[in-house]
Amino acid sequence: MYLTQNKLKFGIQNGLNVARAGYTEDQILTACILADKTGYDSIFYMDHTNVPQWKNATVLDPWVMLSAIAAVTQNVELGTCVTDAIRRHPSNIALAAISLDRVSKGRAILGIGAGEAQNLKEFCIPFEKPVSKWEEQIQVIHKLYDSTPDNIVSYDGKYYKLEGACLQAPPIRKPRPPTYMAAGGKRTLAMTGKLGDGWLPIGYTPVLFADHKAQIEKSMNENNRTQEEKDNFQFALDIDVYFSDDAEQSWAKMKEAVKVSLFKPEILRVHKLKEIEGFDFVKYFTEYSMSDQSWIVKMREAATQMPDDVARSSIALGTPEDIIPVFEEFMKAGVNHFVIRFWGKNYFGSIDKFATHVMPKLRETAKKQNN
């Protein structure tokens, strides 16, 4: 069953792929212009302070870069993938999203997650109660979207408070810039169904995506979301694509990184894999940082024990003919908005090749399945 009530969407992600390659700002903008002209629906930008595993990477502010991208594009939606909620006050995030929405003439998306230690530890920002803070953040942000001097808003949360607050720049997009939540656990998936307009995870197999999608839909029903909200909800996925003439050779290059990205308790659960002894997932996500890279070594050692067939189902490698079936499996699992990280030396060529040889066939597949 294909979930494509809405138009099937494709976007590009300027994330670790771009940071690691060291592309200049001009090169990134050129890639985004190409995506806008070749039929992509969205462009996303990662939000990190650093990437500890690659010391020579270039890491830029997403809101500044997305505003620059807005100035040179006309059609694509523009979003963060994803903003780190715990690092900023919700008023800053709300105003940044509104500002992007206005300069882009109504094309902004707020991709937001709870955060991770690597963006916080050396900056002495406490990584405490991130999920509870994230939930309050989204509630505050949504209130501030509707605020004006004549419609001041208040909020009395445990971590955030507003007392007659307002912003003075209403968003263009109605009812608001959509909120895509980066959820991956039982509690955050329920929050996504309650508060989100979309879901944007990373490191998923089709099996895990379908499982978590069902949890979100259950929460949407429990929270009495309207039919319109359900119909417009974006089940997005940050997915890796590596074009090459030899899929096996590409898999050999990407194998370790893919397993590290995929390695999480929920993957072990849905694929009925044994727990990896001696690895503490909670400590990894709360302690891994630039100053303590021992955790990435531990992660690599543990992740290599994951079966190849499970890991490989999460990534699209090889020729267009190799890649299309991978996307079709995710479409069956419920993805209706693909956010693609292109890997390899030819970023521009990959953007064009996907638009020319993959995108039309997937759109046709979705159209046939829904007729």
What is each residue range found by the language model?
Residues 1-72, 76-77, 177:
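N-terminal beta1-alpha1-beta2 module of alpha/beta enzyme domains
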Residues 2-4, 131-170, 209-332, 363-371:
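An alpha-helical appendage that flanks or caps ligand/catalytic pockets
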Residues 10-14, 43-45, 78-80, 108-112, ...:
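Hydrophobic faces of well-ordered beta-strands that scaffold small-molecule active sites
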Residues 23-35, 96, 183-191, 319-329:
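Short, acidic/polar
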Residues 39, 47, 69, 100, ...:
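Conserved, mostly hydrophobic/aromatic
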Residues 42-65, 69, 84, 121, ...:
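Glycine-rich, proline-tolerant flexible connector loops at the mouths of alpha/beta enzymes
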Residues 56-79, 137-140, 144, 355-369:
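Alpha-helix-loop-beta-strand connector modules within alpha/beta enzyme cores
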